[in-house]
Amino acid sequence: KAMTATASAGYNYMQEGIEYAVSGEIPCVIVDVQRCRGENYATQADLMQARWGAAGDHEMVVLAPSSVQELFDHTIRAFNLAEKYRTPVIVLSETTIALMRENLVIPEPDQIEIFNRIKPSVPREQFVPYAAAPDGVPPLPSFGDGYRILHSINPHDETGDIHWKPEEYDRLYQRITNKIKANYEDIVRTESYYLDDAKIGLVAYGSESRPALEAVERAREKGLKAGLLKLSTIWPVPEREIRELANQCDILFAVEMNIGKYAGEIERVSNGACEVVRITKNRGLIHTTGEILADMEQKLGLSLR
């Protein structure tokens, strides 16, 4: 199994390799510890690059840890998803988390769920490298198993041979994207806090979900029916959960440590069901709870502190 890690600037140079991994269906895990340009200050500015940085038609799986424990747990899950769907998986960490010191529970090895790639069940002479199973994922032998392994970034047929037939090109990339789209239930993860009766919703991911949750709890102490939707998976977008929250709430606050990027996705998915307000910070520091509450106060005309 393959993994590498970088911090923002280095992630730029990995985009061609990620494109290759998508097209060649090569399972791997990339950890990007987001930081401000040239400095070790905190940010969530690589959000769109994690989804759209690589060229060509593709879906990306991107996980957003909010703690040291989640960074550990999400990395294990990233390997499982990469192996299951033969795709690169991004763990989008942040300087905030990288510099944290927190307790970490490491389970016993037999308590950790591990998914190993599905290998061919046919004899070597019958193996077709890109003949997909019903779930859209071709079995993948390991190097040394004796099977013919061929990886190519170029359009190819089931045998792995390069070609330029338009219908084969379309068939290939429809399958590569659909194997992610069709497994929404398995890939997408969110956490809900105080949402049962919420009329004011906060949506956050990564380290920003920490002060956002405290802001929700403080607002509730003041009688405001607030709740938090925490996104553990940010790509694919948790559209169902965001849409349900938008239909339930009068207003959604999108809390981010950038100039306001994922808010656009929340607005798109909400589709006018409620107002979406951006709470952004782009100063190399995580939001404080007070800053989030101050922005909520300004919009709602209430005193929450």
Where are these regions (language model features)?
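Glycine/charged-rich beta-loop-alpha catalytic/anionic-binding loops adjacent to active sites
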Residues: K1-M3, V33-R35, A55-V62, Y194-L195, ...
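Phenylalanine-focused residue identity feature
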Residues: Y13, Y20, Y41, W52, ...
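A structural-propensity feature for long, helix-poor, extended segments
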Residues: Y41-E59, C249, A254
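Flexible, low-complexity linker and terminal segments
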Residues: E83-R305
